[in-house]
Amino acid sequence: MAFEELLSQVGGLGRFQMLHLVFILPSLMLLIPHILLENFAAAIPGHRCWVHMLDNNTGSGNETGILSEDALLRISIPLDSNLRPEKCRRFVHPQWQLLHLNGTIHSTSEADTEPCVDGWVYDQSYFPSTIVTKWDLVCDYQSLKSVVQFLLLTGMLVGGIIGGHVSDRFGRRFILRWCLLQLAITDTCAAFAPTFPVYCVLRFLAGFSSMIIISNNSLPITEWIRPNSKALVVILSSGALSIGQIILGGLAYVFRDWQTLHVVASVPFFVFFLLSRWLVESARWLIITNKLDEGLKALRKVARTNGIKNAEETLNIEVVRSTMQEELDAAQTKTTVCDLFRNPSMRKRICILVFLRFANTIPFYGTMVNLQHVGSNIFLLQVLYGAVALIVRCLALLTLNHMGRRISQILFMFLVGLSILANTFVPKEMQTLRVALACLGIGCSAATFSSVAVHFIELIPTVLRARASGIDLTASRIGAALAPLLMTLTVFFTTLPWIIYGIFPIIGGLIVFLLPETKNLPLPDTIKDVENQKKNLKEKA
């Protein structure tokens, strides 16, 4: 915790931190559209089989010259159970007799129809083009749409696992810059992917980069911030993610073509990559990894930016070494992921934090995936989701500062669980109430993410924070992958998935009681700091 002494000499919340936030917040805002891009880029428009009599571009398809388009559609495409044109089958031969029959009479058998062997015709009133229309991901191939989302999620999972290790090895700044460039290139190339498999590979790489950007954007700035302002920074960062969802709704509404949307979302990250050269590496990480000269330069640069004039005289290698000697000695022992579980206090903390992340991610993604059933158009729904999450995340800042870390998490997790469980008993006819409860659940789930993130940073020591962050984010990605799979349980009981979504956060809220309160406490740098923190809390109790 000695780094807090050095931070107080260079300024824990000044011009440098503000400039850092000016870079980080916009990059987080524009990152979310990349993660949720398939909500629009892979939208499935209305479609039907291509029919010679209707869709022959030569103009000779309608040989009668007197039949309307509706009449030609009637004799060419069978009706489904809702008396709407089938999306995946057509008549082998025109059924002229249907022109003289009541619309509710079906005089043809399954043998009279065939799949869409000549392709499909898509409704372009909402989206002129999506990856679904480009590669015909409908009917028997509709499941391929979920392959893209699965691979993106898998990329984020792999990024969560690897990101912490490479960041501890090569530094937060270098890995962040690499991933900013990788995301810009891969998602720009995805807009021009020649085949569906190539598109999938590029989206996997985009997911890999996205997760590391989220992690490495948050860690350095929180390490440069004084303890009593860390909650504010985390809330601002998570609030930027919510604003990103609102931005996505607006971008998708303006740029309906999926390729244009990809390019528009990707170009800003080339700019972020160029601007990131002025980012300063975490001095805490530099010192802990025995790069004292570089750490001293970083501290002096921060002091100059913050207007601390006597920093050159007061800050030198001897001061840094003597202040951080205990942490330097502890850091000489190479840390691994196993170190998170060797110490009883660390083992308890990491296991609880991982479960909390997992328990909140399942209802968050479970609710988000099924928001389409609310009935609103997807553009408005995306904006509404982001707006509600942003408002409740701002509320989380007040609860974190006034009620503490533990009580905030308990409050929000209980509200998530109770709102989801209550919604299972609300009739579908009561749409307003269902939407209100769904928004409450999503908003509180977003606030829980912010609360857990603040508590996580204050519970895990610097030497292990990036690796622990990788494990934490891995648990989040696993929860996200499981959330939609739980919907298959509806074959046993229609409300069973929702009951599971509601129970997990309630259990998580109860487990939070096992963690210590860390409000206004300095960040631990080593495992020994964690032990000392534990002793101090016991003495106060």
From Swiss-Prot:
GO biological process: what's one of them? organic anion transport
Please list the disulfide bridges.
Answer: none
Expression by tissue, per the entry, reads:
Detected in fetal and adult liver, and in adult kidney.
Q: Which keywords does this Swiss-Prot/TrEMBL entry list?
A: Glycoprotein, Membrane, Transmembrane, Transmembrane helix, Transport
Please name the Pfam families in this protein's record.
Sugar_tr
The residues that carry sugar chains are 56, 102
Q: Known SUPFAM superfamilies for this protein?
A: MFS general substrate transporter
Q: Where is the protein situated, by its record's location annotation?
A: Membrane
Q: What kind of membrane protein is this, topologically?
A: Multi-pass membrane protein
Stored Gene3D superfamilies:
MFS general substrate transporter like domains (1.20.1250.20)
Segments on the Cytoplasmic side according to the record's topology features: 1-15, 167-193, 252-259, 371-377, 428-436, 494-495
Which ranges does the record mark as transmembrane? 16-36, 146-166, 194-214, 231-251, 260-280, 350-370, 378-398, 407-427, 437-457, 473-493, 496-516
Give residue spans on the Extracellular membrane side: 37-145, 215-230, 281-349, 399-406, 458-472, 517-541
PROSITE patterns per the record? MFS
CDD domains, A to Z: MFS_OAT (cd17374)
Q: Name one GO molecular function term.
A: transmembrane transporter activity
Give any Gene Ontology cellular component.
membrane
Classification via InterPro entries:
MFS_dom, MFS_sugar_transport-like, MFS_trans_sf
What family is this?
Belongs to the major facilitator (TC 2.A.1) superfamily. Organic cation transporter (TC 2.A.1.19) family.
Q: What is this protein called?
A: Solute carrier family 22 member 10
According to its UniProt entry, this protein's organism is Homo sapiens
